[in-house]
A protein has these predicted regions:
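Conserved catalytic alpha/beta cores of large enzymes that bind or transform nucleotide phosphates
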Residues: 17, 25-28, 75-170
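Extended, Lys/Arg-enriched charged tracts that mediate electrostatic binding to polyanionic substrates
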Residues: 6-73
Length: 170
């Protein structure tokens, strides 16, 4: 129902703000010498677009853009930034997974695909999808309660990779 969806959203937002009091968050603050009173936080709600396969929902693609490129290659410049793209949810990128990385000013200059050996070793092999079996269950502070980490071969088997199709929002 609409009311239960609103409550789940409200609980999720409260959970994000409460996370600053978690042990890991406090340890991070201490390790980085950050002061909690000077920290800022925001919650961004984004529509997830992709396709459903049984009890799994495959987000089409995720990306993280950074304004600085700390490791420019060739004629790239630090101020041109970088983009990391991945199949599935952005958690894979944020968690440090192997993703496609490039400078938006040099989109055809991708080190990871320059040689077959590098491509096989340094490209994405896993990704996150939404596990719809937990849809509608009570909110959990565990950020993985409704996620599955799958091998890219699963997406290929389900038909998510290799053919064009219409995306539907979740």
């Amino acid at each position: 129902t609409r009311r239960s969806s609103d409550l789940m959203l409200s609980d999720a937002i409260k959970g994000v703000y409460a996370s600053v009091y978690f042990r890991d968050s406090k340890a991070y603050m201490q390790a980085t010498s950050n002061v909690i009173d000077q920290e800022k936080m925001a919650v961004i709600l984004q529509e997830v677009v992709g396709n459903q396969y049984g009890d799994r929902y495959y987000p089409s693609m995720s990306g993280v853009a950074r304004s600085l490129n700390y490791y420019p290659i060739g004629d790239e410049k630090a101020e041109e930034g970088t983009v990391n793209l991945a199949l599935g949810l952005g958690k894979y990128i944020v968690d440090g997974g192997m993703t496609l990385r490039f400078s938006p000013y040099h989109p055809h200059q991708i080190l990871q695909t320059s040689e077959m050996e590098i491509a096989l070793k340094e490209t994405q092999t896993r990704f996150y999808v939404l596990d719809l079996r937990n849809a509608g269950h009570d909110f959990s502070m565990d950020d993985g309660f409704n996620l599955l980490k799958l091998h890219v071969k699963e997406a290929e088997k389900d038909g998510e990779i290799g053919r064009a199709h219409v995306r539907t929002p979740v």
